[in-house]
Amino acid sequence: MLVYFADLAHDHFKVNQYTPTGIGYLTAYSKFKFGNHVEFRLFKSVNKLLDTYEKEKPDLVGLSNYTWNTGLSKFAGSFIKKRDPSLPIIMGGPNIRIDEKGIEEFLRKTEYVDTYCMFAGEFSVYEILKFLLNQPRNQRTANDLRNHITNGCYSIYNDRLIGNSNYTRPDDLDEIPSPFLTGLMDPFLKEGYYPIL
């Protein structure tokens, strides 16, 4: 299974650019749990994401949602969804209201997002990947994911909001590996991105 996670930023200048630590933690935890059963590729550049997408189609795309990258995520998500409507796209990040009315409004206007992961997403993303891995390849679709309830996530299915905000916290922070110690941030550090610790 191939997964693309993107924490997109404008990359005209490498001024004040930070490593994609959030998606790094999602990846580090799921890599720890799945080993080589899932391959991850991380992106900061929208151009690199879309160029890679054109060469090799993933099984899942995940986008971050911050005030500074809303437009980039929308551009990339809409581009991918237009070309492959059945490809599941998930999103997470703090740039969303946390009440169900606000979540529903967001998902209805952001049609390229199939599932939104609320709060810290390490466990939710792991559960999504586990669900998709347990499906036959032809049932790893956007519609199948929208119909699946994952704790801490919301979707629009059959024209209604489904899901919950039941976020699971780790009992021990050491349960989630560091994306820096696992080497996931090395390519970004080599490109001159600043670490967020």
Q: What feature does the model see in each segment?
A:
Residues L2-V3, P88, D114-T115, Y193-I196:
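Beta-sheet entry/capping signal
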Residues L26-F32:
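A short, N-terminal amphipathic alpha-helix
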